């Protein structure tokens, strides 16, 4: 006698209705929920209810294991997206991962987190190779150097910042000289009349 497990439990409809479990993640978005900030059908609606806080978040670590109890009220993403996965803490601490390449968390290169050296971007860093910041070598943009680059920030070449290099001294006129100029102006006006 062969024993088969049931594919659905008695409480499965309750989970689908109350927590949206087991529903197709690719189902269409509910228009009523998007337009009116609420669906009249509530939890019995077969369409997807997406809150605006859902967008651009990291994936819920509990949902990945099938243990998230918040359902649609969860502030994290319930979608398998490799770019939005939480960062692998083991990789952060040790520089390698024992689960790699099967690790479902994000592995970010530690060198990419080092901030850019502003002095090197301007043209010269006196710290040289001992600098704790990142030195990125890029060719300067010829168009930018001659005055204007139409590509702007999306240009693949460097646009060096010349902040603070040309600090000219501001010359203020002497108050006595200003008074002399005013008297000269008055005499010219009198002569014209």
UniProtKB/Swiss-Prot annotation:
The keyword Lipoprotein does not apply. It is found in: Nucleus. GO terms for molecular function: RNA binding; zinc ion binding. Gene3D superfamilies: Zinc finger, CCCH-type. One of its GO terms (biological process) is mRNA processing. GO terms for cellular component: cytosol; mRNA cleavage and polyadenylation specificity factor complex. A zinc finger (C3H1-type) spans 24-52, 54-81, 82-110, 111-138, 140-162. Keywords: Metal-binding, mRNA processing, Nucleus, Repeat, RNA-binding, Zinc, Zinc-finger. Pfam families: zf-CCCH, zf-CCCH_2. Component of the cleavage factor I (CF I) involved in pre-mRNA 3'-end processing. Belongs to the CPSF4/YTH1 family. This is mRNA 3'-end-processing protein YTH1. It comes from Yarrowia lipolytica (strain CLIB 122 / E 150) (Yeast).
């Amino acid at each position: 006698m062969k024993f088969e497990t049931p594919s659905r439990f008695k409480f499965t409809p309750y989970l689908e209705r109350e927590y949206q479990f087991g529903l197709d993640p690719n189902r269409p978005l509910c228009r009523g929920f998007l337009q009116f900030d609420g669906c009249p059908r509530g939890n019995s609606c077969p369409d997807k209810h997406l809150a605006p806080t859902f967008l651009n978040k990291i994936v819920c670590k509990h949902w990945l294991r099938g243990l998230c109890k918040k359902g649609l009220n969860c502030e994290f993403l319930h979608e398998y997206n490799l770019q939005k996965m939480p960062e692998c803490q083991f990789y952060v601490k040790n520089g390698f991962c024992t689960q790699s390449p099967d690790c479902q968390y994000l592995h970010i290169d530690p060198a990419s987190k080092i901030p850019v050296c502003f002095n090197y971007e301007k043209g010269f860093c006196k710290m040289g190779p001992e600098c704790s910041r990142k030195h990125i070598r890029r060719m300067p943009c010829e168009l930018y150097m001659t005055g204007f680059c139409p590509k702007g920030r999306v240009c693949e070449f460097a646009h060096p910042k010349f902040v603070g290099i040309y600090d000219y001294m501001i010359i203020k006129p002497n108050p006595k000289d200003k008074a002399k100029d005013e008297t000269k102006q008055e005499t010219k006006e009198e002569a014209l009349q």
